């Protein structure tokens, strides 16, 4: 098993990536290079930074990548709030995605704390 797959933080981020990709399929075409792309990139970045950090040798390097992942998750939170405000996402869908984002952020933060 790849080293990153054992972390709940990565597992939650991976689920979030898939959910964001599905949810953004229905965004307007004019948002393809805007909010659609930004939301997808932020979600993907969170998971990808955990993957990259897990491949590093030292704890400090891993913590650095976890910091980047946390920033990406915060960026995604804002993108989802904008998408809901613009009515690209139904309130229920936005709430589900935001709950997933919060869960992913929590486990990523806990993983970072465990690296002390």
Regions found by a protein language model. Name each.
Residues 1-116:
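Amphipathic alpha-helical assembly/interaction segments
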